[in-house]
Amino acid sequence: MTIQGSDRKGTLLLLVMSNLLFCQNVHPLPICHSGNCQMTLQELFDRVIMLSHYVYMMSADMFIEFEKRYAQDHEFIAKAINDCPTSSLATPEDKEEAQQVPPEVLLNLILSLVHSWNGPLFQLVTEVDGIHEASDAIISRAKEIGEQNKRLLEGIEKILGQAYPEAKGNEVYSVWSQFPSLQGIDEESRDLALYNKIRCLRRDSHKVDNYLKLLRCRIVHNNNC
């Protein structure tokens, strides 16, 4: 099987799984019950990774849905793609590079990525909800991702506090000057900006999910996985 064919099958499987979870109203377990967090580090990692993967699946699903409805031609996609604002964060490009980053530094980078999306996700929900022709699927997923991102942030903070308490407070947040409000702009510009924002969300949520899995292997399993 070619890599391209494998990628297509993986994307389709991701879409099916995301739809199944969302339609059945299946959500990841809370990070901590009633604020009481008597968990081992492995339990915290397992629960946070379940949540990060859910957020990534929802983001990928929303991107596929938006692309299907608004980005059918190559010219649109070429005009839409710009750098993501979080590109200012010096995140590793691949697994080998991530392995060279100290775990406490990588955890703070993950925390920075997730925290940097809090405000833009709230803005995204408002913008998508204001598009009359937007599908219920896109609107619902935007709202769900916004809620789950807050829980993901809480979980990563708990991991950092338990594993490396001395490293807390070292995160750096990106500035979102590239994603101004979409009010008052023409329809094409709005669609281009939304496409890029959702694309960046998918990219960053995938990074977070992969980094967390890598860190679980390094910290919990001592690289024996």
Swiss-Prot record:
Residues annotated as signal peptide: 1-28
Modification Phosphoserine occurs at: 52, 116
Stored InterPro entries: 4_helix_cytokine-like_core, Somatotropin/Prolactin, Somatotropin_CS
GO terms classed as biological process: female pregnancy; lactation; positive regulation of cell population proliferation; positive regulation of lactation; positive regulation of receptor signaling pathway via JAK-STAT; response to nutrient levels
Keyword Cytoplasm in record: no
GO annotation, cellular component aspect: extracellular space
Disulfide bond recorded as keyword: yes
Places the protein is found: Secreted
Alphabetized Gene3D superfamilies for the sequence: 1.20.1250.10
Main location: secreted
Pfam family, one: Hormone_1
Disulfide bonds: 32-37, 84-200, 217-225
Alphabetical keyword list: Disulfide bond, Hormone, Lactation, Phosphoprotein, Secreted, Signal
Any one GO molecular function term: prolactin receptor binding
UniProt xrefs under PANTHER family: PROLACTIN, SOMATOTROPIN,PROLACTIN
Family: Belongs to the somatotropin/prolactin family.
Oligomer status and interactors: Interacts with PRLR.
Function description: Prolactin acts primarily on the mammary gland by promoting lactation.
Designated name of the protein: Prolactin
Taxonomic source organism: Alexandromys montebelli
